[in-house]
Amino acid sequence: TLRMTDPRSTPSTLSSPVSRLSRRAALGLMLGGGASAAIAQGAPAVMRSPLPLPRPDGLHKLSYTSGAELVERARLTGAVSYAVADDTGKILEARGVDVALPPASVAKAVTSIYALEHLGGDFVFTTKVMATGPVVDGKVQGDLILVGSGDPTLDSDALGALAGQLVALGITGITGAFYVDGTALPQIEIIDDQQTEFASYNPSISGLNLNYNRVYFEWKKEGDTFALKMDARARKFAPDVRIASMSVVDRGLPVFDHEAGNAQDVWSVSRSALGKGGARWLPVRLPRLYAGEVFVAVANAQGVELPQALHIAKRAPDTAEHRIVAQHDSQALTKIVKHMLKYSTNLTAEILGLTASGARGLDPQDLY
């Protein structure tokens, strides 16, 4: 199908100040019970209201676990600092505010400077659709090629817009094959082999990337089984994909397991870890074919019939025989860098480094 489109848990208060207050209050009432009863007997009815007095404002906050208690429970022996603020920016609680610590993912700042220096702030990634022949009666007389430049921000909606450009040209199909070209950058299996394989921030890299090379896995409990869904969702388009499959297995650990293949990412998940339902992103190990499958889906949905995507071994040239029929430009590099630093996006950082090195005349084949 194609779709065009915390709660806060309160800690136990058994040992909280609120509970101690209640017990002490109860003890006081018991000790003074006789006097209280005598006074109550002679008091007018209006003074013997069954409604309790209101609690003071902010009393519920006493039941919350403080940050200091959390640090103590975790037995953290190193330098710990934090700051908790509300929506207005008011600091509610802080620890070690004067401790100088390096920011997270500090290497991304260096990568940003490197990319801006060698690519320029106005640099854009361009994704193209190229035809190897003329259009006759709505059909390209030859092949169609989806050519990537490494754009780390390309998503399913951008592919949908590319397909829309084909529609605007009156293209309804092709007589040849449909290829995906991801040769602008080397194919790198995983960003960091020391990280968990199923972490969505640890995908593969190629010259054609999509949705940060992640696939959306969703599950819902249906009786004794689960309904599973794998899709390439963005804001407008969310096509189901077959490039990644999932099965539920009876095991403890690992929660997720992956088997690499030439035509499909085969995943399995522990049944005991699923609960009643949920969703999460998983990394894609076949990004070029992933992008190709999604492009076929969004194109078919708009009336452009394309066959299954195939790899291209050599980069498609810009010649008369390879005519550009659709094109998508990313945002300027300055905006891409800003987004990367805000969300600490690993894929973007690595691609910027590879692309900047290529602009210098280097030919990096890995991340080291």
Regions found by a protein language model. Give the residues of each.
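N-terminal secretory signal peptides and thylakoid transit peptides that target proteins
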Residues: 6-33
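A short acidic/small-residue loop/turn micro-motif
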Residues: 34-40, 98-100
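N-terminal glycine-/serine-/threonine-rich phosphate-binding loop
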Residues: 57-61, 86, 90-92, 100-103
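A short, well-structured edge-of-sheet supersecondary motif
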Residues: 71-95, 311-312
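Conserved serine DD-peptidase/penicillin-binding transpeptidase domain
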Residues: 41-72, 117-368
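A common structural microfeature
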Residues: 79-81, 106, 126, 143
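Short active-site loop at a secondary-structure junction
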Residues: 78, 94-114, 118
